[in-house]
UniProtKB/Swiss-Prot annotation:
One matching Pfam family: DAN
Signal peptide residue numbers: 1-22
Protein name as annotated: Bursicon
The keyword Transmembrane is assigned to this record: no
InterPro entries per record: Cys_knot_C, Cystine-knot_cytokine, DAN
Subunit description: Heterodimer of burs and pburs.
Positions of the CTCK domain: 29-119
Function statement: Final heterodimeric neurohormone released at the end of the molting cycle, involved in the sclerotization (tanning) of the insect cuticle, melanization and wing spreading.
GO CC, one annotated term: extracellular space
Length: 153
């Protein structure tokens, strides 16, 4: 009976730990094996083993602790950290006279993967919700805390 409680408690702790990781947003970014199909017009596509960066990284948008009228954002993305190149020969049976039957193609793959800042959004690219028409309805317009700036006058 004691063993049953210990095993049950261990399973519960593991489940809670995984749930906490998902809620907190633990960084999980790694190089994952994939198969890429290299193609070139007139050549036979060739599958080659490669790597891709896959995973998730912590990101957030929140009200600033010191300036409540401003927002703080952190946007992290799973990206490559360095790259490697490989030269692969493709067979081209439909090569025109004078062209080679084999063509060298250069391909790239990530060397390592890590959470790095996403490309920044320029201020001019952000359209206020009032202009975009998104703030006309929804939970933020009916809340006493979130009113359109035109309603405050």
């Amino acid at each position: 009976m004691l063993l049953y409680h210990i095993v049950g408690a261990s399973v519960l702790i593991c489940l809670l730990n995984e749930t906490a990781k998902a809620i907190i947003g633990v960084d999980e970014c790694q190089a994952t094996p994939v198969i890429h199909f290299l193609q070139y017009p007139g050549c036979v596509p060739k599958p080659i083993p490669s790597y891709a960066c896959r995973g998730r990284c912590s990101s957030y948008l929140q009200v600033s602790g010191s300036k409540i009228w401003q927002m703080e954002r952190s946007c992290m993305c799973c990206q490559e950290s360095g790259e490697r190149e490989a030269s692969v020969s493709l067979f081209c049976p439909r090569a025109k006279p004078g062209e080679k039957k084999f063509r060298k193609v250069i391909t790239k793959a990530p060397l390592e993967c890590m959470c790095r800042p996403c490309t920044s959004v320029e201020e001019y690219a952000i359209i206020p919700q009032e202009i975009a028409g998104f703030a006309d309805e929804g939970p933020f317009t009916t809340s006493a805390h979130f009113r359109r700036s035109s309603d405050l006058q």
